[in-house]
Amino acid sequence: MSEYLILCSILFSLGAFGVLYRRNILVMFMCIELMLNSVNLLMVYFSALHNDQSGQVFVFFIMAVAAAEITIGLAILVMIFRHLGSINIDSLKKLKW
């Protein structure tokens, strides 16, 4: 049991570190997905541990919503890159009114 908890906490920590310390928006999206997938892995593990399938079904819905989120996020990212020529988070200050 502790191996899954350790793995998920390491993955979540790596994702949180990437979101906090990286300036590239694409890398930040990947780190957010890493955090989300670590929580999904933990939810699947606890669902299997308690012989309950509802947690595993819930993970499928989370993955579908995450796919839609990434699709919209990447579309916005492409438009930002076309407009500014950079996907650095600091370049978004140019979009202020």
UniProtKB/Swiss-Prot annotation:
Asked if the keyword Isomerase belongs to this entry, the reply reads: no
Q: Known EC number(s)? A: 7.1.1.-
Segments spanning the bilayer are 1-21, 25-45, 57-77
User: Which is a Pfam family this sequence falls into?
Assistant: Oxidored_q2
* Annotated keywords: Cell inner membrane, Cell membrane, Membrane, NAD, Quinone, Translocase, Transmembrane, Transmembrane helix, Transport
InterPro entries attached to this UniProt entry: NADH_UbQ_OxRdtase_chain4L/K (IPR001133), NUOK/Mnh_C1-like (IPR039428)
Q: Does the keyword Cell division apply?
A: no
Q: Where in the cell is it found?
A: Cell inner membrane
The top EC class, named as a word, is: translocase
Describe its membrane topology: Multi-pass membrane protein
Which reaction is recorded as catalysed by this protein? a quinone + NADH + 5 H(+)(in) = a quinol + NAD(+) + 4 H(+)(out)
Report which superkingdom the organism of origin falls in: Bacteria
Q: What is its main location?
A: membrane
| GO terms, molecular function | NADH:ubiquinone reductase (non-electrogenic) activity; quinone binding
Q: What cellular component GO annotations does this protein have?
A: NADH dehydrogenase complex; plasma membrane
Q: Name one GO biological process term.
A: ATP synthesis coupled electron transport
Q: Which family does it belong to?
A: Belongs to the complex I subunit 4L family.
Function summary: NDH-1 shuttles electrons from NADH, via FMN and iron-sulfur (Fe-S) centers, to quinones in the respiratory chain. The immediate electron acceptor for the enzyme in this species is believed to be a menaquinone. Couples the redox reaction to proton translocation (for every two electrons transferred, four hydrogen ions are translocated across the cytoplasmic membrane), and thus conserves the redox energy in a proton gradient.
- UniProt subunit comment: NDH-1 is composed of 14 different subunits. Subunits NuoA, H, J, K, L, M, N constitute the membrane sector of the complex.
Q: What is this protein called?
A: NADH-quinone oxidoreductase subunit K
| Source organism (scientific name) | Cytophaga hutchinsonii (strain ATCC 33406 / DSM 1761 / CIP 103989 / NBRC 15051 / NCIMB 9469 / D465)
Taxonomy, top ranks, is: Bacteria, Pseudomonadati, Bacteroidota, Cytophagia, Cytophagales
